[in-house]
């Protein structure tokens, strides 16, 4: 099963194929998208029209308007396909449906949805008159043009005047349609995250906490041993599990860290560092739960050892760019992002003494900062590939406020958008649960 990233990538490749007029490749890429949206069926229909196959285009536009019954531009293009098949009555019906979906608006701007096209009401009426001309209904065609002219479309008065003159002379009209080469494009905010990162030759292992690791540099190992750091198997436990090509939340690290860390090793002498290590009160157990999805480019046939090395380098990069969060004492659900150095130092000062230690979470969000966290009030099932689904009580990291109604967030290694009305700020959810108590059932 392809991931969201793979589907967006195929969508983008299909758009590029349309731009170079490679119709077969475009259809192949658009057809590879799992559970296609109405926009994807629309794209297929446009490609079939450009390739000169109106019959296949008609089937694709049928699926598009079935998926989205309010898709005015879909009805417009289906009318164009029927017109090319000389089904003029069906074309008139489709243009009427397109006009109905305009809902008395003069224009629908599809640019914000990824299609560089503005559907004008006068164009739909013009096409309706054109189909009526082909059906021999010249009087109806003239009346339709009168209705189009009455809307006083900006910049189209001359076109409609010429069209009226042609109809009076019983000269057929040419159709208006979506310009050649224009199809729905994927959301721009996803495109910048498509390219996998090349980790070959860029990451270096400067130190290791793995016992008997022969890859660490001798000088660094001797410094660590002299400072009293003797990593053992109990200090580092890594469990890596994969499902469906994605790294699932299965990477856990338990290690010892200073409660109030001072300067780095290069700024502290080995003697003072060793003294600090021997003081048990200066140490606290930190458990880090990591969630990563790692994209890799590897040569076909790469050996297991080489692949594990590349994966280790990729994980090293992810830990450097991932979002750290901590679980406050007594909190079972809420993870609070650590966004600044001051935040971390405040956490060190408030870590309680005891075996519980400090619980951290590191999530791969491609280096994007977490604005705040929200908690789901209801279940939300993804309706489209770009959506993020969750269940009631799940905590979601908010990465971006898309608009007044939608947020972009991250949960369990997945990034997507979701309705703002399904979530509340983490603190508000906790307060509501304390006041109201658990609520039976949920809402989809």
Swiss-Prot record:
Protein's UniProt keywords contain Cytoplasm: yes
Biased composition (Polar residues): 230-246
One Pfam match: SH3_1
Ranges of Low complexity composition bias in the record: 258-274
Keywords of this entry: Cell membrane, Cytoplasm, Membrane, Repeat, SH3 domain, TPR repeat
Function noted in UniProt: Functions as an activator of NOX1, a superoxide-producing NADPH oxidase. Functions in the production of reactive oxygen species (ROS) which participate in a variety of biological processes including host defense, hormone biosynthesis, oxygen sensing and signal transduction. May also activate CYBB/gp91phox and NOX3.
UniProt record similarity statement: Belongs to the NCF2/NOXA1 family.
Protein name per Swiss-Prot or TrEMBL: NADPH oxidase activator 1
Organism encoding this protein: Mus musculus (Mouse)
Source organism phylogeny: Eukaryota, Metazoa, Chordata, Craniata, Vertebrata
């Amino acid at each position: 099963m392809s991931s969201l990233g793979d589907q967006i990538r195929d969508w983008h490749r299909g758009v590029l194929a349309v731009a170079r007029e490679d119709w077969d490749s475009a259809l192949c890429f658009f057809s590879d998208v799992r559970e296609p949206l109405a926009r994807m069926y629309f794209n297929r229909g446009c490609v079939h029209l450009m390739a000169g196959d109106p019959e296949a285009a008609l089937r694709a536009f049928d699926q598009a308007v079935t998926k989205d019954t309010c898709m005015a531009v879909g009805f417009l293009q289906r009318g164009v396909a029927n017109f090319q098949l000389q089904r003029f009555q069906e074309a008139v019906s489709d243009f009427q449906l397109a006009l109905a979906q305009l809902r008395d608006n003069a224009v629908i701007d599809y640019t914000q949805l990824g299609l560089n096209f503005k559907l004008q009401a006068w164009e739909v009426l013009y096409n309706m008159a054109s189909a009526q001309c082909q059906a021999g209904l010249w009087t109806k065609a003239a009346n339709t043009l009168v209705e189009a002219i009455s809307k006083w479309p900006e910049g189209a008065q001359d076109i409609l005047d010429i069209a009226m003159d042609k109809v009076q002379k019983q000269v057929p009209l040419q159709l208006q349609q979506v310009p050649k080469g224009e199809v729905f494009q994927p959301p721009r905010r996803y495109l910048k995250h498509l390219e996998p990162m090349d980790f070959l030759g860029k990451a270096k292992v400067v130190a290791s906490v793995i016992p008997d690791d022969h890859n660490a540099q001798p000088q660094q190992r001797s410094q660590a041993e002299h400072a009293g750091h003797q990593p053992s198997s109990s200090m580092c436990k890594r469990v890596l599990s994969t499902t469906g090509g994605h790294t699932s939340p299965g990477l856990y690290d338990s290690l010892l860290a200073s409660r109030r860390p001072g300067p780095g090793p290069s700024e502290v002498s080995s003697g003072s560092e060793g003294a600090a290590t021997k003081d048990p009160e200066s140490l606290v157990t930190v458990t880090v739960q990591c969630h990563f999805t790692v994209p890799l480019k590897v040569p076909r046939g790469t050996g297991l050892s080489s692949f594990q090395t590349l994966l280790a380098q990729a994980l090293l990069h992810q830990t450097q760019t991932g979002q750290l969060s901590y679980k406050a004492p007594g909190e079972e659900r809420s993870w609070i992002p650590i966004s600044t150095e001051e935040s971390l130092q405040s956490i060190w000062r408030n870590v309680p003494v005891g075996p519980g230690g400090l619980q951290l979470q590191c999530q791969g969000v491609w280096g994007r900062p977490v604005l705040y966290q929200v908690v789901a009030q209801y279940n939300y099932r993804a309706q489209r590939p770009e959506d993020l689904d969750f269940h009631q009580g799940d905590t979601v990291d908010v990465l971006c406020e898309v608009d007044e109604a939608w947020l972009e967030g991250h949960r369990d290694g997945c990034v997507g958008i979701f309705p703002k009305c399904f979530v509340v700020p983490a603190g508000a959810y906790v307060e509501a649960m304390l006041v109201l108590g658990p609520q039976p059932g949920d809402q989809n």
